[in-house]
Amino acid sequence: MARAYRLGEDLGTGAKCVKFLINLASTPSMAVVPTAVELCIQAAVDDPVGEARWQSWFDQWLLELQSAGAVELTLRLTDDAEIRRLNARFRGVDAPTDVLSFEFEADDTQALIAEEPLYLGDIVVSVPTATRQAREFGHTLEVELAWLAVHGLLHLLGWDHPDEQSWRAMVTQQARLLKGVNVVYDWPSVYPVG
């Protein structure tokens, strides 16, 4: 499939890309809706979660979000230097952040919709920032990475939080999705609204 990654040359330097296919059609609850998720994990830093856990999480999240059809996305685990560079380049903020999402943009939307798998975009997570936040918020790094990954996934699917109401709706959805993979995140006391 020909596509122009939003991050293009930014992804791939020194990173191993591990792809695996999640066949959601084999899941009993989705037997009627054939769905597959191709997840590409690029780890520029050590991956504290592991491929099997990422696979399980994205599998369950997209099942719960009732994603139909085949989709593909990239998860990039990186450091503060790289995410700071991306944040400055794409958001004009010269500082590291925890997670960035880059929805796939296509000139020909109809051609994109006809392709399978449908490429959703890229999620980039800073593991050092996630480590600091996990320590600050009093939970494990795995919990923080799950929170950030599902936040990025929701952005790829069109969710946003420009105001308090949309923020609350989005973090409520994140908490629900995390509960589905047995990850407990006490967001009301951890993240401020906004």
Swiss-Prot record:
Needed cofactors: Zn(2+)
An annotated GO cellular component: cytoplasm
Residues where Zn(2+) binds: 151, 155, 161
Annotated EC: 3.1.-.-
Keywords, alphabetical: Cytoplasm, Endonuclease, Hydrolase, Metal-binding, Nuclease, Ribosome biogenesis, rRNA processing, Zinc
Textual note on the cofactor: Binds 1 zinc ion.
Entry's localization field: Cytoplasm
InterPro entries, A to Z: MetalPrtase_cat_dom_sf_prd (IPR023091), YbeY (IPR002036), YbeY_CS (IPR020549)
Protein name as catalogued: Endoribonuclease YbeY
Source lineage: Bacteria, Bacillati, Cyanobacteriota, Cyanophyceae, Gloeobacterales
Family to which this protein belongs: Belongs to the endoribonuclease YbeY family.
Lipid metabolism listed as a keyword: no
Molecular functions per Gene Ontology: metalloendopeptidase activity; RNA endonuclease activity; zinc ion binding
Purpose: Single strand-specific metallo-endoribonuclease involved in late-stage 70S ribosome quality control and in maturation of the 3' terminus of the 16S rRNA.
